Amino acid sequence: SYPAVPQLNAEKKELRLDVDTLVNGINKTIFATADDELRPVMNGIYINLAPDALTFVGTDAHKLVKYEAETENEVTASFILPKKPANLLKSVLLKEDDAIEMAFDSKNALFKLKSHTLVCRLIEGNYPNYNAVIPSNNPNKVLVDRIELVNGIKRVAVCSNPTTNLIRMEIADNRINLAAQDIDFSVSANETISCSYDGQPIEIGFKS
């Protein structure tokens, strides 16, 4: 027989969420989630509800994204939304108008839309203390055109090693220098982007 739809318990919490806020939160964090059988809590988006803010977090222990949106609700709680229903929810939400109704308990979440109702099992466990790894009072601040930076990374990444996808970024003198190379095929790429930078010269490496 077809599986029964999970029922939320009497201690469930309910609220209304703005569609754009939920879609943006999923879009900006889902790419940073993991596929880790040993640490399943990282395989979803951590969502924290507070009276004046809604926080979305995604991490795979190598990269971390935290997205905050202002909101007004009376619920204080948190849960971990699995990646698959998050993607499904995002697709369905694009066809919605303003707000959706949501309810959740310690095991399941229910999203009620105009023509759909999505029920999913939440990931159980304690999410890592992500605030502990976010630097506070960082003296280095850079302001750069996002599209220009993204396009520069895409162009340079073509010449990175396909195994590591490593790109080197040097920031100094109001310039960002992007570099990548694949020694096996004797190819390399460099690109310089203008920026506004306040801080000491730094050099970092990351996966493209």
Please describe what each predicted stretch is.
Residues 1-208:
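Structural preference for solvent-exposed beta-strand-turn elements
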